[in-house]
Amino acid sequence: MSITRLMRRLKTKAPSPLRSAGALQMAVLILVALGPASAQSITELQRGFERPPDDAKIMMRWWWFGPAVTRAELEREMRLMKEGGIGGFEVQPVYPLLPDDPTRGIKNLPFLSDEFIDALRFVSVKSRELGLRMDLTLGSGWPFGGPYVPISEAAGMLRTERLKLPGNSSHLPIPNLTAGEKLLAVFRARTQGQSIVADSVRELTDIHDGAVWLPENLEGPHEVLFFISSRTGMQVKRPAVGAEGYVLNHLDRVATEHYLNHVGDRLMQAFGSNPPHAVFCDSLEVYNQDWTSDFLEEFKQRRGYDLKPYLPALVADIGPKTLDIRRDWGKTLTELLNQRFLTPLHDWARRNHTLLRMQDYGVPAAALSSNAYIDLPEGEGPQWKILRASRWASSASHLYGHQVTSSETWTWLHSPVFRATPLDMKAEADLHFLEGINQLIGHGWPYTAAGVEYPGWRFYASAVFNEKNPWWIVMPDVALYLQRLSYLLRQGQPANDVALYLPNDDAWAHFTAGNTHMIEILRDRVGPNVVPAILETGNDFDFFDDDALRQVGRVDKDALVLGANHYRVIILPGVERIPPDTLQKFEEFVHNGGTLIATRNIPQLAPGFRATEAEQRQIHDTALQLFAGLSATGHLVRDEKELGTVLNSLLKPDVTFAPASPQIGFIHRKTSDAEIYFVANTSNAPQNVIASFRVQGMQPELWDPFSGRTSRANVRLLTESQTVVGLALEPYGSRVLVFSKRALPKTSPQTGQPAVPAPIDLSTDWRVTFGDNAKPLVMDQLRSWTENEATKYFSGRATYEKEVNLPAGFLPPGITVKLDFGDAKPIPEQPLRSGMQTWLEAPVREAAVVYINDQRVGSVWCPPYSIDVTNVLRPGANRIRTVVANLALNYMSGRPLPDYRLLNLRYGERFQAQDMDKVLAVPAGLLGPIRLLANRSSKP
């Protein structure tokens, strides 16, 4: 049972924050006791892979622009999603794209209005009829906020004013205070250049008549520092009509509950007794939120001392205790987020019988363990060799017992809009799979009002994955590939050997006013070397932190057990501060035979301003015993370039590739009956490797996520400790290998080697019809549509037709024939501002559906650009028909770009369309060469 299911069963009244946290921890402990998901036989696993369940389908973020929506168009788009293999959507109301215009049927329904709620209600009912999952963003745009958030409940910040003290001044005026602001304290400090002299900071308490009064005879240059409890003033980003306003104070429980009562309860009126599957909270982007009005009181209660005299430590170095003070401030920020935002949000979702899906990272400072409050953790970002939100989310799922981890996928994919291809989709999705993701939330599906000029509405900074793309003809096939992998990567349990410790205390210690982005600071603390070293030595890992260790961690023999996961190696990346109980647990782990590695340095400090001398001595002495001297049982790697070598000497890799191929990644899951590996080539070059798997006593099979078929793997060697398999991976190619003990069919003995017929070239004289009603033309040589002025800006589908006469000798027994469209060519990678793209010139631009003798054979949209046609060819005449689709971008490039002047005058500038200078026509069609290629087949 996952925590998701368990939370659905908890129908209690809203508890207090402490009781809620206790109930949550109890739920986590119950899940740990329950252990892994129920056993599944290899036959059942294969059956599910062939026909994966609907809940493994990709979903889409459905942007409702305005929202200028109508029932007819909403239903049409939902039916299109269903036809495209998309399993559901998340409704996100965002900014308008047209002013109200009755002549065009455009009416923007104000957010939370009766008309808007009625549209939601209609979609709720219709989505259930269609079998589509519906999630709902609990607001408009992001972060949470709007006109219902008064300034007193808006996001808080610590405002600091630093003024140089003029010579012979007796006083300075207090800075102007606006609504919601309060002066906390004033300090003076001597300066040296641009820096404050650490031991010179003194509080100024003589404040009256609108000024702070200074002592006489100050020596040297000075600054005066004013600390003000303030508001960020941040407005909701990309709001719908009627959703404009301040961003919510995420560190104020009363403000959170007011928001949920006003917005959440109103939205739930659309659903009645059938709530959405989940409500969604986007990534925490409450920029500069590092304070709340009662922070000083809360800090004193939690940390045991008054922060007020030490406020300058948050902006400057005031001495040896500076980082300890910042650590305490940061820890308090995280605690307040957990208790005042995440707890009431989680409890509200439970009361409304729905799940909480959330991107739980950013600002305010969410920790990895903050995901204990989330039913469905979600990440984003395809960067698989750094600390990124997708692996952050999957690690949380692994620790807290969730089988499903989603990611916001394809954000910024191959900008500009309508430039992304099916291959781009696959390549990025594979990277998310490598990070442990198994539910893709596409970013996204733009609603388009009826009558809007092709190619319709689009989000300002994203790809589009609706039917406006001509390549939509292969969307069901792309979606099925992703669905099969999403299903398979949910089965059993993750099989990661390494646990990578996140030093929260070090991250908090490096917070400064206005810079409290937890995951980014942790990324800097972990550094650029550790994650690649783990992955490139053939291992995989999860992140964890101190609170996760306390909640779900224990030592069992030589393993650190976190939830249902057993880790054989713990890595401490450059850790300076560590809680005594954490280090004590690591000491127990090493004593029982586990492997503990520290990089760069050994921990030396107990965290916090009030850490005692005994605690400091305990950390110092324990760390020395573990990592220093001849009797050290831990391992210190000062130069992280050596980490891979050390790790290899201490842990047999799960998978290795020969030759070494850092561009190849893998993820491993295990069931009671099978070992499941997904392997992906993340590069634009083919990779031919020998893969050695740390699996014994099992037979490997190749499971094809494109077709659902299984076949015997190319086993090179079987030993008592490993299985060696040959893999030939195309550019951006992927494979699934499943190891089990079931007997494989024996290969039939070869009774003779049939002669392989010579290739047949099909690159000339195709009849090509653009669109549905155009007159066919003869293309004597294959060329891009953009080379002809008449089709340069054509976006759509063209049908290529040709008849081929095959001699009887071309199809002898034992021969497999493929229709080959040519090889892809790598192009040099270029730095990108954001997002990703594939770096490949494909021979098919961008997708093709192949028919032989009027029978659909399949589609071609990624390497290898070929398709097996053995069973549909016949001696004599054969009719080949290939429907080819390109990008909507080409049509856009031949038209004026949208003019948002009147829109901006009406509603203000709520977005800026990105990369419009890159809206240029790109090659389209079949570029060839096209051949029929025959090869000997090996059939079992």
Indicate residue ranges for each PLM-predicted region.
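Acidic/aromatic-lined carbohydrate-recognition and catalytic surfaces
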Residues: 94-207, 215-217, 226-229, 233-237, ...
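Carbohydrate-binding surfaces of carbohydrate-active enzymes
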Residues: 58-59, 70, 75, 88, ...
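Short strand-turn-strand beta-turns centered on an Asx-Gly dipeptide
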Residues: 851-858
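Bacterial N-terminal signal peptides
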Residues: 23-35
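N-terminal secretory signal peptides that target proteins for export/translocation
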Residues: 1-20
